[in-house]
Amino acid sequence: MDASADLAIRLRRAAFNRALAEADLAAIGPVLAPNVVLVTGTDSAVIAGRKAQLQAWKQEFRAPSRIVYVRVPNAITVSAAEPIALEHGNWRGTSSTSEDLIASGEYSAKWRRTGEGWVIEAEIFLTLA
C-alpha cells in the first residue's frame, strides 16, 4: 500500500466534505476531474462533467433546508501500475437545519493523481437507508 497516496486521498476527501458542509463551490471544483462522473444512489441519475456537478451542487446549496452529505472512507486501494486509486466507504446525508439523518449508504470513488494532486474521476452511490 502507498501510505502517502492513501493519506493524500483521505485529506482530499476531508476537504471535499468540508466544502460540501460550507457550500463552497470554489473548493469543490479542484477536487473533481474535468470529466468526472457521479451516479446517484437512489435513481442512478448520471451527472457527467465537473461543470454539471458544480451546477447540481449550486442548486442543492440554494435549498433553505438542504441535505449535507459526508463521505467516510473505509478503505483505499492504490494501484501500483497506474496513478489511480479506488476508495470505498459509507456516506450519509443530514438535514442542514436539524441534523436529522435523511439518507445513508455506501459508495465507491475512483481517484487519479494529476499535476494538481488527486482528483475524483468517478463516484457511485448506493442508498441503503
Task: Indicate residue ranges for each PLM-predicted region.
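A solvent-exposed, acidic/Ser-Thr-rich amphipathic alpha-helical stretch
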Residues: 4-7, 25-83, 102
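Generic short beta-strand segments
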Residues: 35, 88-94, 126
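A short, structured loop/turn motif at beta-sheet edges
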Residues: 77-84, 111-117
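A short hydrophobic beta-strand element
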Residues: 82-91, 105
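Short beta-strand edge/turn micro-motifs at domain boundaries
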Residues: 104-129
